[in-house]
Amino acid sequence: MSVLQLPEGESADFSQGEVYFIGNATTLIRFGGITILTDPAFLHKGQHVDLGHGIWAQRMVEPACQVADLPPVDLIVLSHYHGDHFDPVAARDLDKDLPVISTYDAVGKLGPLGFGHGYPLDTWDSHLVEKGEARLKITAMPGLHASDDATAALLMPVNGHLLDFSRGDQHLYRLYITGDTMLHDRLKDIARFYPDIDLGLIHTGGTTMLVTVITMTGEQGVRAVEITRPRTAIPIHYNDFSVFMSGLDDFKKAAEASSADTEVRYLAHGETYTFTTKG
């Protein structure tokens, strides 16, 4: 397993961390002195993004901040290289020396844009990040961007990611990000190989390209929660673009009917979820 060594910063807080919801699948995750930016997309409301295959989507909700508003970021964790997950603003304004952990496909496409520090992961592969006492193990989780083989072949590969935070050898917190996956059988392997997930960030929205749904609906997102069994779940990626056909209300309705023990929390753009750890 390769190791990314980050410069040690100021004294880190290992008692709690936070997830700041910027919009779509863009979050800022901070714990133990490590700051992670996920799926950076900063287009303004009303602007359009190219999703490929001649399909464009309009941004419907303004992101909570812009790149210039961010604190210092240590690395980017990217589900895949679609325009609503790494948009032209991110490509233009983000520091191109930032490490990017993603699929082989995404890392290959970001290189020509100047992002030369890519760390590609296949499913179940891991990369270790160290910063002072903090250790972050990032493992690629299985993702499937479409339920039928023909559509999946047209779309790019997608990863979920498991973030295991530790202080030295003491494991403190486990966070799962679904990425833009559909429901599929390999999600059951996540619960089997990686139980005790503390927090799940669940990509929903029912993204529809032409007539094909390529991300989970709200109801399917709740089913993913039931399968992976995080202690707490937060739905994201639910209302930002015109191709989303399943809003947050669909998730809420299904969550109310679910018998899962998971606590569900809801974040609007610009809100923060603070979590406490075992350490």
Report residues per predicted region.
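Active-site metal-binding loops of divalent metal-dependent hydrolases
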Residues: P40-F42, Y81, M141-L144, G179-T181, ...
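Pre-active-site segment of Zn-dependent metallo-hydrolases
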Residues: L6-S11, I34-L78, P88-D93, A146-A152, ...
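Cap/insert and terminal regions of metallo-dependent hydrolase folds
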Residues: R59, P99, D105-G108, T181-E271
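Short, hydrophobic beta-strand segments that form beta-sheet elements in well-ordered domains
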Residues: E18-F21, P99-T103
